[in-house]
Structure formats: C-alpha cells, structure tokens
Amino acid sequence: MEQYIIRGGNPLAGEVEISGAKNAALGILAAAIMTDETVLIENLPDVRDINVLLEAMESIGVKVERITRHAVMMNSAQIGDVSVDYEYIKRIRASYYLIGALLGKYKKAVVPLPGGCNIGSRPIDLHIKGFKALGAKVEIRN
C-alpha cells in the first residue's frame, strides 16, 4: 500500500483558495428563487450545469446579472412563469432543485424530469415522495 510520510516540525503559513462546489451551488441558486430580494452569490464554479440552470431561471423571469465568472446578482421578484422549458432541463440533472423552490414560493411548478447524466438511472422518486408528504399533488406526464 502506498503512503505519504510527512515530517513536521516547521510552522505552516499561507493561503488556500477553495473553489465552489457545483452541487452546493445548484441548490443555492435555486433557493434564491424563494426571496424577492436581490441576492449576490459568489464563488460559483464556472461549469456548464451552473450556466444552464441560470439560463433556465432567466427563461422564467429571474433577473440574472453576471458580475464575474464566479459571481451573479439575481432577483426573482418578477417570475412570470412556473413552467421550465425542456430545452434547458434536458441538459442537466438539477431540475428537481427548481421544483422545490417554485413549489415553496408559488405552490406550483411544471418542470421536466431531469436529463444530462451518463452515469445511469438516478430516479428522483425520493424528491417526489417528499413533495407529496408536504402536501403537493404530483402529476407525471409524458
């Protein structure tokens, strides 16, 4: 078995920059829908899933301003539609994040089932059970 052997004895000093985590950022972005306040979210990874989710959110009326590659300013006060287009959702698995946020704020969400995954089947049945347990009526259509 390989191992690292580290001999200390010297004080450590310096800085480490930690980049944002994609899955945490997806949930945080969706949660920002819940408030009508303007929200600044920093330390976002610059990856496809984040960018597609932001596009999907813009398509339903969320105002998104890219401040830097890793920061956005968002305002969800003017969401005009709770139906997210399949063209966005087929590219990512994060659609279920939007379901919870839209249900929480508007008591309704029309969101296609998630796509974007080559890992294999990862159903969202536990999310659906949770929505039902909280009183939502869930209808799955083809």
Model-derived regions: residue spans:
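Structural preference for solvent-exposed beta-strand-turn elements
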Residues: 1-142
